[in-house]
């Protein structure tokens, strides 16, 4: 059997802290795997298959923040961050979809490799985000207001144009631009079966998946 390296170990559920520009950055890391002084950071997520297929930018941001915290923790050791992974537990995994599509996750639990940033990008991101929160705190102290989160942070859906039959809610087809919707509507009207089978175009403004009304989950 192989003799393990002195630093080899697994650390589960550890919360780390680091001071950045006078503020405390904190993160709870699900799993740290150290092998031959190389650290793999693993985060567990219950998510959808589509999140794995299309990816989520916030995963990359989150795990690189964990990488920053680990780099501070192991600063005076030989241990270096080597890789970042998401262990995705897919609540909606479908065996039939996996058999039909190569790009569909092939198991209900999969590992997703996350890009590890270089030190310059990582330090810049951490510094910028801390600065943004500090500025927001100053504004709140002055006039009681916070800046709004960005559309990406609020998971805003894109605007769409739905071609639908008059008085019916269900769309015949939904488009990402008005011009395409108009072309489809024109072609549909040419081949309609009944004189009263009229259509209309309904504009659907992009909604926020997060932060509906006065609710904020952050």
Region spans (language model):
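Metal-dependent nuclease catalytic cores that hydrolyze phosphodiester bonds in DNA/RNA
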Residues: 1-39, 50, 54, 99-103
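Short, charged, amphipathic alpha-helix that recurs within catalytic cores of restriction-modification
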Residues: 58-69
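Conserved beta3 VAIK motif of the Hanks protein kinase fold
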Residues: 42
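Metal-dependent nuclease catalytic regions and adjoining charged, substrate-binding loops involved
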Residues: 21, 68-218
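Short helix/strand-bridging catalytic loops that position acidic/His residues to coordinate divalent metals
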Residues: 46-58, 109-112
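Short, solvent-exposed loop/turn segments at secondary-structure junctions
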Residues: 17, 47-49, 89-93
């Amino acid at each position: 059997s192989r003799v393990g390296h002195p630093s080899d170990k697994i650390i589960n559920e550890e919360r780390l802290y680091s001071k950045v520009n006078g503020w405390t950055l904190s993160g709870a890391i699900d799993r740290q795997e150290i092998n031959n002084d190389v650290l793999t950071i693993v985060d567990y997520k219950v998510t959808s298959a589509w999140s794995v297929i299309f990816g989520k930018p916030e995963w990359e941001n989150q795990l690189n923040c964990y990488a920053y915290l680990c780099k501070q923790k192991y600063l005076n050791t030989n241990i270096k961050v080597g890789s970042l992974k998401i262990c995705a537990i897919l609540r909606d995994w479908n065996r039939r979809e996996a058999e039909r599509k190569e790009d569909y996750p092939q198991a209900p639990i999969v590992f997703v490799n996350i890009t590890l940033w270089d030190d310059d990008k990582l330090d810049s991101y951490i510094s910028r985000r801390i600065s943004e929160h500090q500025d927001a705190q100053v504004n709140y102290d002055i006039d009681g207001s916070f800046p709004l989160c960005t559309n990406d942070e609020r998971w805003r859906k894109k605007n769409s144009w739905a071609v639908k039959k008059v008085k019916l809610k269900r769309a015949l087809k939904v488009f990402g631009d008005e011009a395409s919707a108009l072309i489809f509507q024109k072609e549909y009207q040419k081949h309609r079966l009944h004189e009263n089978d009229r259509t209309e175009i309904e504009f659907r403004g992009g909604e926020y998946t997060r932060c509906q009304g006065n609710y904020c989950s952050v």
